[in-house]
Amino acid sequence: LIMGADKLKLGDIIFADIEENEYLNELFETILYSYSLKLFELDKTNQMKEFNLLDALRFADLLSKSTHPECSTVHKMWAQEIVILLNELYGDDPLVKLYASAVFTSTGNHQGLKIIDSDYQGLDMLERVFTQLRSDYLTIPAEPKMHFFSAQKEAYDHLSDPCFSYSVPTSMGKSFIMRMFIKDEIINGAQKNYALIVPTKALINEVSGKIIDDLADMLSSKNYRIVTAAGDIALEEDHNFVLVLTPERLLYLLISKPDLQINFLFIDEAHKLSGKNSRGPFYYKIVDMLMNRPQRPHFIFASPNIPNPQVYLRLLLDAFDNEDENVLAMTYSPVIQVKYLMD
C-alpha cells in the first residue's frame, strides 16, 4: 500500500485505531462481566453472557503483536489482560492455554508462561526459532534459569552507561534489575564498589537481605562485604563493598572516608530527589560530591512510573551529553489490575 511517498504497512492500518473497534470492546466488556460474576460467586444466580471465545483469543493474539509506534505497549498489556481473564474463566480449555502462551511469548512475559504452566515453543519452525532466540536474549546472565521481561532487559543493557535514568511500573522490579547487574559483575570478577541508595532505614534490611541471598557464598569467595552503616567495621578492612544506605548514611560515609572509591551509584526511588521531604538535600549533596571526584562513578537513577525520568540527568548535564539517549520511560507492566467501585 502506498500513501504519498511513504509506504503504508498492513500493521499501520490494523493497529491505527484497533482500541476503538466496537466488536473488540463488546467482547472485552462481556469477558469482564463474566469474570466479575465468577469472582463474586454470582455465576450460579446470574447467567453469563455468551460470546465467541475464538474471536476474543484471536484479538488478543493480534494485540500482542502490535507494532503501533505509540500504542504498542498499551495493546500488548490489553492482550495480556484478555488472556488472563479468559484463563480464569476457561483454564481447562486447551485453546485458551495455546493462545495465552502465544500472547505471553509475544510480549516476552516468561513469568506468565510459568503461571499457566506452559512450555509453548511456537506453531511453526520460524516461530519456534524466534521463540528460542527471544528466550536466549531475555535470559538473565547472573540467573540463567530466569528471564527478564523485555522492558527490564532494555534497562539492564544501559546500566553500564556513564549515566542512565529509567522509570518503570512498580511491578517491573527496578531494584531487581540493579541487583542482577551487580551480581553479574561480581561473578565475572569485578573488583568495584557499588553504592545503592534507598530512601528509608526500613528498606536497608530488605534490600541488603536480597543482595546477600543473591550473592551467597560469593561474598566471601570474591571478597565482598555488604555495608549498611557508615561505621561498619568491614570498611576498615581490605574488601570490595556493596553499600546499601540511606542518603544521610552515605553522605556521612563519603565525608568520613573521602578516599573510598565508588564505581556505581544506584539511586532507587529517585523521585525522592524532587519530592517534599527532608532527605532531598542529601541526595543532591552526594551527587555533587561524586561529580567533583577525579574518577566519577556511573550514575543510575531508578523511579517508579514517572513520565520524565530525564529530569534527574539534568543534575549531571555539565559532565555528560546526549541526555535523551540515557533515558528510558517504560509503561509496560506484566500484571493486570481489575478495579471495582463498590456502592
Language model features with spans:
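N-terminal helicase ATP-binding lobe
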Residues: 1-343
